[in-house]
Amino acid sequence: MMLQNIKNRLDVVAVLLVIISVGLIQSSTVLGGDQSLFVVIAQLLDSGKTLYKDLFDYKQPGIFLFYLLAGKTFGWSDIGIHLFELGYWILFSLILFSCIRNYSLFRADYFNSLLPLFIIGAYYGNATIFHLTQLEALINFPLFLIVWLLDRAYKTESGLFVTYLVIGVLIGIVLLSKLVFSPIIFFFLLIHFIFTLKSKDIKYIFVKQIIPLCIGFVIPLSVFLSYIFIHQIENLIVDIYFKIPTSVIALEDQVDPDRLLSSLKWFIKKMLVLLLLAVLGVFLITKKESHFFSLIIAWGVIGFLVILMQKTSWWSYHFQLLYVPIGVFAAVGLDFVLYHFLQKVKPSTPLIKSFLIVTIVSLVFFNQMNTLWKGANSQNNTRKYSFDYARDDAAKIIQVIKKEDSIFICGNPRMYVLSSHLPELSTNGWILEYYLDYQWDEFYNEFKNKPPTYLFVKNDYDKLIESKHVKLWELMMKEYSEFDSVENGKWYKRI
């Protein structure tokens, strides 16, 4: 028994070391445009500015709070943000180690320790500048906690009130991170209540489950509502959460089937072996864990539909929402394959058995290891992991900009971070293609009343601005002269 415990601990340590290693390799990756925007908004919040009012964005507050915590913990640098994320994944790994052993998922006990590799290891192995520290990846942690706690509540009646209270809090956190995840939550609860009805009545569900769940949900919701009312942004929240999304979805010029196809190709290419193993794993569901597996299947199916719903996006990072369901079933599938392979081969010593296991697991993650290896050893490494085109574009401005100057970026918000000048206009120059007509009018009025010292317009945004609001473009060309032409756009200085 003691020998088995030591072996289990060695497995856990080995997996943690792998995750820490790949996380540290990825920590040198520069922040992409989306992630830089999150940093900018988090820095604005840290300086006392108001969410949405001082810099507009469509996203719910969860991701901004994550970046705020990251920045306050390890600093606002690329490495600081990524190290905070690595700590987040280490915590998730420890939770997986702790709770997954209570299930009967695998024939071989060591797969309980390997599971984080199928989720977090796959994520780090696949991720590029566009995928790291995106919400769709980060949300896997609280979603898994909801699944685990729902399953725990289904199997035991001890501490039900606290369990459902925590589930409610987690649901609030998920929905305050992205409302579009609500169908996943709905089906989690629907499946859970259906299973519960097999042995309990409606009164039990209402009193023991729904009431504490609602109380828990109200906790994060009330905090956010208090913030809304204190800062008097009620109308803005209604627009951002309900009115604008329906209008943005109707922007047919932003629906790009080729982008969806490209994202699917990227994900399938990276995850092909794991996807095949996951398909096998689905057919190996045990009746004993039918509640848990039903929730995981719902996550995968409804999660994929949620991705398809976002037709004006369809970015490849959206598919990171599926890492847990694919990872769990892929681990179940590989456990089955390895079990029967080892039964047939019958290795003569534990050393040979361990060698075979490590070799096969390594082959399963060949795509991920190959991507990491190419990135870490490429002669053009700056283009792979740490190429910072925004730094090149902003190089001249960084040298000449004064403390009292202001800038506005119609392009990558990373240049705000690099120049140490936060935006003074509420218009979000990173998502102008999603702006509605009335927002262009607001942009014009804001720009006219508070013109920045320097203006950057990325390639193609000049045509976009001119086509969406001629008066705004004419104002820019009248009030500004070209200061610098760079690879990805042009800098202008106010005359």
Task: Please describe what each predicted stretch is.
Residues 83-106, 120, 145:
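Transmembrane-helix motifs of polytopic, lipid-linked glycan transferases
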Residues 84-88, 118, 125-150, 161, ...:
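Multi-pass, polyprenyl lipid-linked donor-dependent membrane glycosyltransferases
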Residues 94, 269-304, 330:
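Hydrophobic, aromatic-rich transmembrane alpha-helices
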Residues 101-102, 138, 144-166, 200, ...:
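Membrane-interface transmembrane helices that cradle and orient dolichyl/undecaprenyl
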Residues 162-179, 185-190, 219, 302-309:
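Membrane-interface alpha helices of multi-pass inner-membrane proteins
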Residues 183, 305, 312-345:
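Hydrophobic/aromatic-rich transmembrane helices and adjacent perimembrane loops
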Residues 186, 190, 373-377, 383-436, ...:
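Short periplasmic/luminal acceptor-recognition loop of GT-C membrane glycosyltransferases, typified by
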Residues 197-200, 207-288, 311:
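Transmembrane-lumen/periplasm boundary regions of multi-pass, lipid-linked membrane glycan transferases
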